[in-house]
């Protein structure tokens, strides 16, 4: 939730005259809202972030993910590639379904974006970040951190039918795995 501050604080931080601040408001350069009493409150944090004045050290992030522990070799290959090509970037690893939006690493990445700490996120493929909701994550990174997502390998363009078919198969695989996992757990409990 944005933090709004009084005019005095904005004037001190930006070192501008109050008339300049009003002109900025009129031009839509700074977000403002009025209290019930008619006082102006400004979203200084957003203004500083949007104009690169927030002084936060932004990081590059390499996000690596595989669906299961059986694919740990693929995860290690992703990490190796990222370490070689992006040595100064922080690496976040996840093991879990691309449909699961509560992965520890993904939540860490989103929190960093909301805190304005990300300059760029690098993933090998778009679906490594998320099978669904990629555009929302991209929007969060852009809006809160003024960052971007870089996809190293882009898949060939799919027709809408191919994309929907692939998505449905992925969803079915996740739920079949859940059902089989529950059955397996029940069998182990009986033994």
UniProtKB/Swiss-Prot annotation:
Molecular function terms, GO-annotated: DNA binding; DNA strand exchange activity
Domain Resolvase/invertase-type recombinase catalytic: 59-191
Ranges in coiled-coil conformation: 65-91
Single GO biological process annotation from the record: DNA integration
Residues the record marks as active site: 67 (o-(5'-phospho-dna)-serine intermediate)
Keywords of the record: Coiled coil, DNA integration, DNA recombination, DNA-binding
UniProt cross-references to InterPro entries, sorted A to Z: DNA-bd_dom_put_sf, MerR-type_HTH_dom, Recombinase/Transposase-rel, Recombinase_CS, Resolv_N, Resolvase-like_N_sf, Transpos_IS607
PROSITE patterns linked to this entry: RECOMBINASES_1, RECOMBINASES_3
Annotation: DNA-binding region: 11-30
Domain of life: Viruses
Function recorded in the entry: Resolvase catalyzes the resolution (a site-specific recombination) of the cointegrated replicon to yield the final transposition products.
Assigned protein family: Belongs to the site-specific recombinase resolvase family.
PANTHER family on file: PTHR36172, RESOLVASE-RELATED
Entry protein name: Putative resolvase L103
Organism the protein comes from: Acanthamoeba polyphaga mimivirus (APMV)
């Amino acid at each position: 939730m944005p933090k709004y501050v009084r005019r005095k604080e904005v004037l001190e931080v930006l070192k501008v005259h109050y008339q300049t601040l009003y002109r900025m408001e009129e031009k839509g350069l700074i977000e403002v809202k009025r209290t019930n009493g008619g006082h102006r409150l400004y979203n200084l944090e957003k203004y500083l972030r949007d104009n690169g004045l927030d002084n936060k050290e932004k990081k590059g992030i390499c996000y690596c993910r595989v669906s299961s522990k059986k694919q740990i070799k693929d995860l290690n290959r992703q990490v190796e590639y990222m370490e070689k090509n992006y040595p100064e970037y922080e690496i976040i690893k996840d093991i879990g379904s691309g449909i699961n939006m509560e992965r520890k690493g993904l939540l860490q990445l989103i929190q960093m974006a909301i805190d304005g700490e990300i300059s760029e996120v690098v993933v090998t493929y778009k679906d490594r970040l998320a099978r669904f909701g990629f555009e929302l994550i991209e929007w969060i990174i852009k809006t809160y951190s003024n960052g971007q997502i870089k996809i190293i390998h882009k898949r060939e363009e799919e027709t809408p039918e191919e994309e929907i078919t692939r998505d449905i198969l992925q969803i079915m695989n996740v739920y079949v795995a859940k059902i089989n996992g529950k059955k397996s757990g029940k069998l182990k409990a009986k033994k």
